[in-house]
């Protein structure tokens, strides 16, 4: 017969007693682990800011949150965006845009482009899987989008990779648990 305490003795301590591991570390080890964690976070932020500069988009990577663009993109697809202002917007192009009063950007296809005599361009969008255009999504009284509304244009995608983000937003406790485990792993990981 195996006692419960005997089973725990064979498991790595970091999986059972995080605070016990922290107490066993000397101050230098703890400082090193915190610094290591800070380096990982700051590196991720620098990469993100670099992508913003390289792509010209305030959000160079987005996740498709609905099925409105099927069959082109499915819920959970990860899109890579660019937003170079000098490129003209064309009908058939897939854009990500923000509408005043809505927090979440929308991924839809440009179906009509209207150019005024003064050079201003306005355009209309629609989800591939939607019956009607997006005028019902725009702010009240707005019939067309302008270039200033565009967050980016879809240049590539990875299918279903963004489902992790959707799951974490749908189940916030899972998100916090995953972040806590990853943070604890980085802090408690020891060099071999």
From Swiss-Prot:
It comes from the Eukaryota. Residues 49-192 are lumenal. CDD domains: S26_SPase_I. It is a single-pass type II membrane protein. One of its GO terms (cellular component) is signal peptidase complex. The chain crosses the membrane at residues 29-48. Pfam families: Peptidase_S24. This is Signal peptidase complex catalytic subunit SEC11C. GO terms for biological process: signal peptide processing. May undergo processing at the N-terminus. The gene is SEC11C.
């Amino acid at each position: 017969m195996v006692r419960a305490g005997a089973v725990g003795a064979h498991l790595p301590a970091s999986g059972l007693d995080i605070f016990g591991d922290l107490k066993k570390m000397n101050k230098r080890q703890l400082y090193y682990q915190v610094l290591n964690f800070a380096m990982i976070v700051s590196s991720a932020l620098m990469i993100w800011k670099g992508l913003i500069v390289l792509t010209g988009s305030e959000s160079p990577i987005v996740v498709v949150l609905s099925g409105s663009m099927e069959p082109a993109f499915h819920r959970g697809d990860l899109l890579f965006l660019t937003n170079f202002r000098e490129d003209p917007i064309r009908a058939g192009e897939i854009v990500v845009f923000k509408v005043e009063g809505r927090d979440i950007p929308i991924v839809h296809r440009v179906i009509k482009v209207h150019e005024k005599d003064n050079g201003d361009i306005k355009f209309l969008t629609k989800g591939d899987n939607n019956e009607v255009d997006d005028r019902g999504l725009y702010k009240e009284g707005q019939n067309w989008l302008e270039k200033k509304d565009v967050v980016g244009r879809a240049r590539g995608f990875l299918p279903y990779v963004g489902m992790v983000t959707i799951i974490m937003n749908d189940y916030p406790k899972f998100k916090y648990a995953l972040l806590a485990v990853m943070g604890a792993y980085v802090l408690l990981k020891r060099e071999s």
